[in-house]
Structures are given as C-alpha cells and as structure tokens.
Amino acid sequence: MEKIQNVLMKYLMPIANKLEQQKHIQAIKDGIVASIPIIIVGSFCTIFLGIANLLGSGPVYDFLNANMGVLTYASAFTNDMLAVYATYFIAKTLSEKYDLKGSQPAVTALVVFFILCAVVKDGQLSTSYLGSTGLFTGIVAALFTVEIYHICYERKWYIKMPESVPPMVQDMFAALVPLVLNTIIAVAIANLSLTFGKVAFPQLIMNALAPAVTGMDTLPALLIVMFFTQLLWFFGLHGPSITSAVWASFAIAYAAENIAAYTAGQPVQHIFTFGLFYCILCVSGSGLTLGLNILMMRSKAKSLSSVGKVSIIPGLFGINEPLIFGTPIILNPFMFIPFVFGPLICTTIVYLTMNLGLVGKPIANPPGFLPPGVSAFLMTLDWKSVVLVFVLLILQTVFYYPFFKMMEKEELQKEQALEK
C-alpha cells in the first residue's frame, strides 16, 4: 500500500497541482459553476411539467396544462441562454486572475460570442446557439477575448488619457483598442466559418468536439471521472474541484439539453449531468459516506464516535469534509479500497439502471445539498431514483463495514494503550 501511495504521490500530485493552478482551466470551471444557480432556477420550471405528466388528469393537471406557458416561461431565459451566462462568468473569472479591472473584458466577451453565434434567418437573428449548443463557443469567446485584453494591457496597446481625465473616462478609452481588435477578429472568424465551412462557428466547434461530447456521456468516462475524484480526495485534494475542470462544461451542457428536451416533450438522452454527480453519485458527499458515518457514531472507539456525531448533520446535506478530514479518510490504508473503488461499483449500477430505463434520467438540476433521496427525486421526478439512492447507500455501507471494523479495532487498541 505504501509503495502504491508513493507512486501515486509522485506522478498524480504534480498533475493535480498544475490543474489547480492553471488559470484558463480554473476560469472555465469557476465560470461554469457560477452558471449553475441559473440552471437550477430554470430547471424548476420542468417540475411543473413533470407534475402534470405524473397526474395525467384532474383539476390540478388542467390548471397546470392551461398555464404551462407561464410556468415554464423562465426556462427560455435561463436554460435556453446558458451559453450567454457562462461566457460572461468565465471571462469575468479569467480577467480577475489577470488583475484586469472592471467588467469590460466580460462584456466584450459577450459581444464576441454574439458575433460568432450570429445566424440570420429570414431577416431575423437566430437564438439557436445561445443555449447548450453554444456553450463551447462561449468558452472559446471568453478565453480568447480576455487574452486579447491581457496582451493589450501588458504591452500598453491602449489609449492612455491624461491623469486629469476622470477614471471612468480613462477606462472607457483604454477598452477601445482591445474591443475593436476582438470585434474585427470575431467578425472575420464568423464569416470565414460561414464561407468556407458552410456552417456557423458554433456548429463547426460542435462538429470538431463531437467525439469528446459523445464520449463523456458513457460509462467508461464516468468511471474515470469518479476514480480520479476519489483518488484525489484520498490524497487530501478536493477531488470534484479538480476533476470538474475537465467534465463540468460537458455535464452542464448535458443537463441543459435534457431540460430542453423534456420541456419540448422529446426523449431525454443524457445520463451524466451536474445533478447526477452531486445528487446520486456523491449523495452524502464523495464516497457515499453516510453509512460509514452511522457506523462511526455507533463505534466503541471514542475518537471515531465523536467524529461520527459531529459529521452526521453536514453529511445529510452532502457535506462530508468533517468526516474525510476528521477520521481521517485521507491516506488511511483501511479506507483506500472502499472509498476509492466502492463508488465505482455504485456508478456502474446508476448508469446501467438509467441506460436500461429502469430509473428515469435527469430532467432537472436541483441543488445537491438536500437530504438523500430528495434531490434525486427532484432531478428525475421518478420515485425509483429515491429507492436507487438508498440501495447505493446500503451497498456502500456493506462495502465499508469490514474495513471500518479493522480501523475500529486499531483505534480501540490505541485508546486502551493510552489508558494504561
């Protein structure tokens, strides 16, 4: 075990640290995460539609059906405009990392994004790419725009006004050069894409990323994500915070597509969404530790019992850092196998049950800090998802049990030695 830990520490830690420190990757992750509250609000609109579908008939159904346009109205300005908000947040985050003041870089990123997505049909501007289909274009627009700003300011390629001019006016003129450069380049790219690629730039990006977009929503991809998430946690690094830099943009795009499909009465396609990760795969926290928490509460070892009692309330709401650091699970040889590999078995069960249609796929993106089963039901509007959550927790508890007993035995021996 020690040799394995040393090898992983040697090769895995440098990569994880670089991912944590890389500005662009972190800007994408933070920007996507900042967009999630908007998706949560928009996804609640689908709950009204789901309730109507569950009822089938009756006065409540008639009321919901008659007012569905009003009840789902907000969805058009939240889920259906996901790429707009993500573009702004990503650009804003990256500009802050470069110490660029004000909101001008983020607003310019929106200008670039709209130019790249501009498709005129019958004299009207299409909104086709403002949602999940334009998300990757938004990422490109945000990163590109801020880089242009950074280069311009670093090399002093901007209009510098006398110090007697008010700061607001100085900032306005300073932003002109990078704004003009970004606009010219965006117009050129958009027209080149339409002229030579015969498609809008967002579609060109989607075509190029098609293998990755399709491949991320598969069982092997999910298992890889979960494995590295748990492994990083085991070594004391915040697993989801690091791995989400890779998968967050895909997961939130899948969620938006599912919500849009369900609202339109079409089949829901995707399994791997932000909601799935936090509401089911990490229910009660990474490693599905609620069962372990209960075992620790009932432990004869005082140290484990006290940690279990302190951790139970946060654990019910998906926060298990007190348990991870208090036990500790980090670098604990007894916990390596159940904490890292147990969730992989649970992930396989979740994917297969949803893929086979035994449990409904995600149609909403509720917050993951609700008690076990609650967020899963809100995410799928399927009571079987609640059963699935408790089956997973029981299974993971069984998986933890023999390793917990070994850990408890060692802790009892330590406590008895101290008492002597």
Question: What function would you assign to each model-found segment?
Answer:
Residues 2-19, 61, 65, 259-268, ...:
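Transmembrane alpha-helical segments and their short flanking loops
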Residues 23, 83-97, 107-111, 264-334, ...:
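Alpha-helical membrane segments and immediately flanking helix-loop junctions
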Residues 102, 119-220:
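Membrane-interface helix-loop-helix junctions at boundaries between adjacent transmembrane segments
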Residues 23, 27-48, 136-144, 171-193, ...:
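Core transmembrane alpha-helical segments of multi-pass membrane transporters/permeases
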Residues 60-73, 202-209, 267-273, 295-306, ...:
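Short juxtamembrane and helix-loop transition motifs at transmembrane-helix boundaries
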Residues 17-159, 330:
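Early transmembrane hairpin of solute transport permeases
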Residues 41, 83, 87, 91, ...:
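Alpha-helical transmembrane segments in multi-pass membrane proteins
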Residues 180-299:
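Generic multipass alpha-helical transmembrane bundles of integral membrane proteins
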